Amino acid sequence: MAAVVAASRSLAKCWLRPAVRAWPAACQTHARNFHFTVDGKKNASTKVSDSISTQYPVVDHEFDAVVVGAGGAGLRAAFGLSEAGFNTACVTKLFPTRSHTVAAQGGINAALGNMEDDNWRWHFYDTVKGSDWLGDQDAIHYMTEQAPAAVIELENYGMPFSRTEEGKIYQRAFGGQSLQFGKGGQAHRCCCVADRTGHSLLHTLYGRSLRYDTSYFVEYFALDLLMENGECRGVIALCIEDGTIHRFRAKNTVIATGGYGRTYFSCTSAHTSTGDGTAMVTRAGLPCQDLEFVQFHPTGIYGAGCLITEGCRGEGGILINSQGERFMERYAPVAKDLASRDVVSRSMTIEIREGRGCGPEKDHVYLQLHHLPPQQLATRLPGISETAMIFAGVDVTKEPIPVLPTVHYNMGGIPTNYKGQVITHVNGEDKVVPGLYACGEAASASVHGANRLGANSLLDLVVFGRACALTIAETCKPGEPVPSIKPNAGEESVANLDKLRFADGTIRTSEARLNMQKTMQSHAAVFRTGSILQEGCEKLSQIYCDLAHLKTFDRGIVWNTDLVETLELQNLMLCALQTIYGAEARKESRGAHAREDYKFRIDDFDYSKPLQGQQKRPFEEHWRKHTLSYVDVKSGKVTLKYRPVIDRTLNEEDCSSVPPAIRSY
């Protein structure tokens, strides 16, 4: 492969337009050396082709499977495939340990029963309830049943969980978690590594991945899926380091690219959380699901947006208003500060609106931790103590942290079944897209429904990353012939890249991105109303049209971050459009989607009353259904369709489904 890379770089002068100088000598040296293979394996199928463009020759690769993304879900899928004998490529725009999984703090849920008796069926119940009955119960069944084994697997990989005095994995309380189907009090189900669980999990999975012969393509930006006759046959990507274009042809493609939190101005997401996989699926003409459901984490640091883990409240922290009241007792009398995230975020917003906010502007509340023993803060929340001092100037042992709800997670994503297979909905039935899988925050299985429970996201990563690998291993064999692609496959992607590289309009990428983020922040926030959402739809549609007038400044091809950020903006815009149009269309309040003009859930039955004598509402007249959104990429027009929620479990005798009810904490 090194020879191929050298050959592709020698073609650089052929690619560059006359107005652009040849690459400097420093850029023509060998690739940086890592302690694992980053450029793929040498094989007979790897070759340079000019079938798309003489200016942009393409390096072709052939694999059994390609995984896009190397966070928790991507790594688990990639080494699961390699372990099963598949020739696997992992394409990632970041070095694996820079993926956003590293930022997760609180923990990973599993009914281990280390603190009190627990049962995965209780975890199942809490997750269904937390989803506000929009979650698919077959997928939730699969995830919660697999959870204990997934955590033990991580422990066996060497993940250094916090421990009890008896040496068991320590489990803390987290929001929305109960015992005995909501009747037995607060559950302690969240396994953690102090308050740096995501960091530990990602490094554990990365270390494990080095055991296997996976080909890592690091700092390669995935541009688009390679689709033929409704099947996915790989991806096309840009090597950021040297500007080469690469086509990865594979029988199986797994998308694990994370969320799109950067559609908002204030969020806990990394700057690289740009919905790349979600947008690739959209451009392929496939639907995305439930993008209107965006989780606002209750405790982002005021003015900075940095995450303060729910584990703070799990360890005994409380939220207070300007009057010193523990106000969550009013909104969730039983769970109080450990109600689900959507409930806490709305409660905080109401306190601020009604004039009980803190600070000179009365525009935030306080998270109080200084009543807890300093030793507990030092051992269980060391990262938070440091973060609060750096970003808020607060010593948590002496004063409270100013906090405000901040965009944190996308419940929606690429629709999949519980096996990780991407699906569409045709003529009233779910249809699998051959060769395409998704997992992690990029996917919508849908285990989170309208609202995710804290510490279910890391569980989602490892369970469904593994599920993708298992499904591929069940349906394919290593070394099977890889389907062919057209000689010019990917030419539209390269044409778009070339257009952006030489874009000479009037609007900077940063300006358009800021307009999008501020529109989303002000028009699709914790509380939403029809008129504001409609205005937001109009504004975003105009911003989407403005993308035709972008101006980029770097005309080079080597490490052109201006170009990469513009490609990411295109991806963000597709996600933002589907989010706000889906929110405007959904005329109800459910989970994280709270409409002030439609304050209640609209289900197939009125679950606030006895069901006897009620007639089921027609599918068109209720909202307990998944949104499927499509975008015409040329015009930006959004089309919405809907599919039913799956209420059955994988085995009703083993785990009974949970019928909808009024949701309270």
Curated annotation (Swiss-Prot):
Binding-site residues for oxaloacetate, renumbered to this chain: H297, T309, H408, R452, A455
Membrane topology of this protein: Peripheral membrane protein
Superkingdom of source: Eukaryota
Cited PROSITE patterns: FRD_SDH_FAD_BINDING
Short name of any one Pfam family annotated for the protein: Succ_DH_flav_C
SUPFAM superfamilies: FAD/NAD(P)-binding domain, Succinate dehydrogenase/fumarate reductase flavoprotein C-terminal domain, Succinate dehydrogenase/fumarate reductase flavoprotein, catalytic domain
Catalytic activities: a ubiquinone + succinate = a ubiquinol + fumarate; (R)-malate + a quinone = enol-oxaloacetate + a quinol; (S)-malate + a quinone = enol-oxaloacetate + a quinol
Matching NCBIfam families: sdhA_forward, sdhA_frdA_Gneg
Name under which the protein is recorded: Succinate dehydrogenase [ubiquinone] flavoprotein subunit, mitochondrial
Species classification: Eukaryota, Metazoa, Chordata, Craniata, Vertebrata
